[in-house]
Amino acid sequence: LLYGGEELDLEGETIKILHTPGHSHGSICIMCEESKACFTGDTIFDIDLGRTDLNCGSQKEMEDSIRNVISKWDNSITIYPGHDVSATMKQVRKYNTEYLAIMQGTGDGN
């Protein structure tokens, strides 16, 4: 199991485990710092966020994860979600209406 706050070294690549609850209480993102890549699972996608209406999902936790973790990522980071297409954070900040709504304080974008 991987837990938020863990750091791993994989042949010179620093891998950080980031706890990003919202889609589920145990959601994580896996940040590869040197490669500027983040595997986001079902937390964030190119144009929307993971569902929070399923068992163990929480809109408040998702909003906290966006504000306290994901919003701090550099525009050059490429996200690789669990499905759908990859995107840079620059693209996310332009096209992801749910992300933008949370950052602007207007809700979840729905």
Q: Where are the regions a protein language model picked out?
A:
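Short acidic-hydrophobic, aromatic-tinged amphipathic segments that line or gate anion-handling sites
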Residues: 1-4
